Swiss-Prot record:
One of its GO terms (biological process) is translation. Belongs to the bacterial ribosomal protein bL25 family. CTC subfamily. One of its GO terms (cellular component) is cytosolic large ribosomal subunit. InterPro entries: Rbsml_bL25/Gln-tRNA_synth_N (IPR020056), Ribosomal_bL25/Gln-tRNA_synth (IPR011035), Ribosomal_bL25_b-dom (IPR020057), Ribosomal_bL25_C (IPR037121), Ribosomal_bL25_long (IPR001021), Ribosomal_L25_dom (IPR029751), Ribosomal_uL5_bac-type (IPR020930). It comes from Pelobacter propionicus (strain DSM 2379 / NBRC 103807 / OttBd1). Part of the 50S ribosomal subunit; part of the 5S rRNA/L5/L18/L25 subcomplex. Contacts the 5S rRNA. Binds to the 5S rRNA independently of L5 and L18. Keywords: Ribonucleoprotein, Ribosomal protein, RNA-binding, rRNA-binding. This is one of the proteins that binds to the 5S RNA in the ribosome where it forms part of the central protuberance. CDD domains: Ribosomal_L25_TL5_CTC. This is Large ribosomal subunit protein bL25.
Length: 199
């Protein structure tokens, strides 16, 4: 989990016209919401928002908000980011103000480590779930969850319930869900079957 810092400005005016003006000034319109508070409209410099989400943690980076009146020094994560369908640029951002002592639910990417023995034997790696839903304290949000697939053989899978998780992190997905598998038969068996078919 990476910690970032980002300047924000409160704004009293909302609407499509205001949002367009902000974007033309290299600002991103947004809203900050959280437990026990009314949503607050804000604007953020485009490059600052980019920097706040830089690195492996991405939208799960823990951000210290600077400015914004009562929001100053609050901690937040990016809950939702809208992009332009054509340009891919940021259109609007939702920031979730978090309490460091209260658990929250986030989506974390899965990263595979190593080359599966089943792939070396001619199998095909099937990476079915690239993300996991987890629950943890804000300070324990992992940048990613790593799975070592080195010993994964043909016709075998690694399920959600078999994944080693960082301390303080609880996975919410069905423990029986296969995350990564090796499909197919061992290369030697496939070759033997092909030879038998030709004979």
């Amino acid at each position: 989990m990476q910690q970032k810092q980002m300047n924000i400005e409160l704004r009293s005016k909302t609407g499509k016209g205001i949002s367009r003006k902000l974007r033309s000034a290299d600002m991103v319109p947004g809203v900050v919401y959280g437990k026990g508070m009314d949503p607050m409209a804000v604007s953020i410099n485009y490059r600052e928002l980019q920097a706040a989400m830089a690195g492996e943690g991405g939208q799960n980076n823990l951000i210290t908000l600077v400015g914004g009146g009562s929001l100053d020094q609050s901690m937040a994560i990016v809950a939702d980011l809208q992009r332009d369908a054509v340009k891919g640029t940021y259109k609007h951002v939702d920031l979730h103000r978090v309490n460091m002592s209260e658990k929250l639910r986030v989506t974390v990417p899965v990263v595979l480590k190593g080359t599966a023995i089943g792939v070396k034997e001619g199998g095909l790696l099937d990476f079915a779930h690239h993300e996991l839903h987890v629950e943890c304290l804000p300070g324990n949000i992992p940048d990613h969850i790593e799975i070592d697939v080195t010993s994964l053989a043909v016709a075998h899978s690694i399920h959600v319930g078999e994944i080693a998780l960082p301390e303080g992190v609880k996975v919410l997905d069905n423990p029986k869900t296969p995350v990564v598998s090796v499909l197919g038969r061992v290369k030697e068996e496939a070759e033997a079957a092909a030879e038998a078919a030709e004979a």
